[in-house]
Amino acid sequence: KKDGYPVEYDNCAYICWNYDNAYCDKLCKDKKADSGYCYWAHITCYCYGLPDSEPTKTNGKCKS
């Protein structure tokens, strides 16, 4: 397992407007993570305990 920012197909992290921790927790759990929250500094979801196979944010550009 690993911790990190889950990404969509285009290497873009999931935005959590209004710092919605419940949204991120559900999103992370839907991806088989243990839990998640909205990281306020980046307004993106961060997950704990993601499966190693789940893609996470790298240094590559977001292609949106």
UniProtKB/Swiss-Prot annotation:
Residues of the propeptide region, as annotated, are 63-64
Tagged with keyword Secreted: yes
One Pfam match, given by its short name, reads: Toxin_3
Q: Where are the transmembrane segments?
A: none
What are the subcellular locations of this protein?
A: Secreted
The SS bond pairs are C12-C62, C16-C38, C24-C45, C28-C47
Residue positions, PTM Cysteine amide: C62
Alphabetically list the UniProt keywords: Amidation, Disulfide bond, Ion channel impairing toxin, Neurotoxin, Secreted, Toxin, Voltage-gated sodium channel impairing toxin
PROSITE patterns per record: LCN_CSAB
Record-annotated LCN-type CS-alpha/beta domain positions: 2-63
This molecule's function is given as: Alpha toxins bind voltage-independently at site-3 of sodium channels (Nav) and inhibit the inactivation of the activated channels, thereby blocking neuronal transmission.
Give the comment on domains.
Has the structural arrangement of an alpha-helix connected to antiparallel beta-sheets by disulfide bonds (CS-alpha/beta).
Name of this chain's protein: Toxin Tst3
